Amino acid sequence: MVQKNKRPASRARTVTPVAPKRRGRPRAYQPEVALGKALDLFRKGGFAATSLDDLSAATGMNRPSLYGAFGDKRELYIKAYQRYRADAAAAMIDIFRDEQPIRQRLERIFAVALDIYLSGDAGPRGCFTVMTAASEAVADPDIRGMVLEGLAELDKAFAACFRLARQKGELPASADPVVLAQ
């Protein structure tokens, strides 16, 4: 026997979607702040010398929270390196796109790079790619790919600067922008 809906069609209910309630306690950390602290640790000691206990202490997160937020230590390292690259690119992109004379652009680019390398709460931090990522790239193909991609992007940006300078007569016509960039 089939029961008929006793409610008239004009009075049909509409269901309003409700966001599911999160279970457990609210997050006691800010992911971007924690990632920044992990980045500082990895820059200081590299991947191998930075323990999960170090990361836990610096971020204020216990191990399960670290794993839940960022995955394992390698994934956290990769996310920290991606953050480093994104921050560096954001700091320099306008300079690379600027049409100032090449000398002034290069001076500004290297000034920003020095600010990135020499700033930090605990003193100079250096270049993350040179200091730690390059050594990790030897053993890890994913990190190697990221390092090579980052260097290729940088070479491409410098080549574009030199190409524009050559077009504006700031460099001789025989100057090869790609060679100068490398």
Outline where the language-model segments fall.
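Hydrophobic alpha-helical connector segments
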Residues: K79, I93-R125, P177-A181
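Amphipathic alpha-helical packing segments from all-alpha helical-bundle domains
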Residues: Q104-R108, P141-Q167
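Helix-turn-helix
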Residues: V2-K4, V33, K37, L41-E75, ...
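An amphipathic alpha-helix signature
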Residues: L35, A89, E107, D155, ...
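N-terminal intrinsically disordered/low-complexity leader segments
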Residues: M1-Y29, A173-S174
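Short, basic, alpha-helical segments at the C-terminal edge of helix-turn-helix-like DNA-binding modules
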Residues: Q82-A88
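Hydrophobic alpha-helical segments that form the core
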Residues: K4-K6, R125-A134, A157, S174-Q182
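Amphipathic alpha-helical segments used for helix-helix packing
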Residues: R105-L106, G120-D142
